């Protein structure tokens, strides 16, 4: 896979934007951004080099999501979405992204952006499989149920909760369609290793409910 220079320029710009937002705080994240930019520059020098995204390139976003600062997390999720859309995530990195999203759901941070990222992650490729595929569905169900398990007097006053719930419901419908498409494909080629319908039902997803 050849990576075009304009795409690499966009990715470098995202890291610079995150670094600027950090100001003088979070030195490790700034250093991670600088390291990622250097790695991208090396790739820019030879466009024939295949870019197999690794921990160095997602690390700035991982660290930023751990800060619990909404502005940094929002920027990071948008950056991750671009990496996904450009087909730059390998399997290991994609699973790290799922774990990041899980932690954000647990802490009720940027839920709408999390749902958007899940959609991009599962509709752009077929890297996410097995337990991590089930986990993405569980996250969506949890956010959908948020409207029902939260005190209704609070829901009535907080439109954001209702918006999150309705967005999660729409996301679930879309992801179920994706899962069934994979099931149909698996019936043709059972060696692909995608999460089968039976395994999805049998999987102990209850342990992920928050």
State the predicted function of each range.
Residues 1-6, 13-22, 38, 138-210:
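Alpha-helical repeat/alpha-solenoid scaffolds of the HEAT/ARM/MIF4G superfamily
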Residues 4, 50-58, 90-99, 111, ...:
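Core helices of alpha-solenoid repeat scaffolds
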Residues 15-44, 70-82, 97, 107-121, ...:
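HEAT-repeat alpha-solenoid elements in large eukaryotic scaffold proteins
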Residues 29, 41, 45-46, 53, ...:
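Eukaryotic cytosolic "membrane-facing" regulatory regions
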Residues 40-43, 47-50, 60, 66-67:
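C-terminal transcriptional activation/regulatory domains of eukaryotic transcription factors
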Residues 45-51, 85-94, 123-133, 178-187:
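Flexible loop/turn segments at the boundaries of HEAT repeats in alpha-solenoid HEAT proteins
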Residues 65, 79-86, 101-105, 114-125, ...:
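Hydrophobic residues within the alpha-helices of tandem HEAT/HEAT-like
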């Amino acid at each position: 896979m050849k990576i075009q220079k304009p795409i690499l320029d966009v990715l470098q710009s995202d890291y610079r934007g995150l670094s600027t937002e950090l100001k003088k705080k979070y030195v490790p994240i700034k250093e991670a951004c600088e390291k990622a930019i250097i790695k991208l520059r090396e790739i820019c020098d030879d466009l024939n080099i295949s870019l197999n995204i690794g921990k160095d390139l997602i690390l700035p976003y991982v660290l930023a999501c751990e800060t619990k600062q909404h502005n940094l997390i929002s920027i990071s999720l948008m950056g991750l979405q671009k990496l996904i859309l450009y087909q730059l995530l390998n399997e290991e990195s994609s699973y790290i992204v799922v774990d990041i999203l899980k932690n954000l759901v647990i802490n009720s941070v940027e839920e709408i952006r999390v749902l958007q990222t899940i959609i991009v992650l599962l509709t752009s490729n077929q890297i996410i499989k097995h337990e991590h595929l089930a986990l993405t569905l569980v996250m969506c169900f949890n956010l959908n149920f948020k409207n029902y398990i939260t005190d209704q007097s609070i829901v009535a006053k907080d439109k954001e909760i209702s918006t999150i719930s309705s967005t999660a419901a729409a996301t679930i419908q879309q992801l179920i369609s994706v899962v069934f498409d994979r099931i149909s494909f698996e019936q043709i080629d059972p060696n692909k290793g995608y999460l089968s319908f039976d395994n999805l039902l049998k999987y102990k997803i209850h342990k992920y409910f928050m």
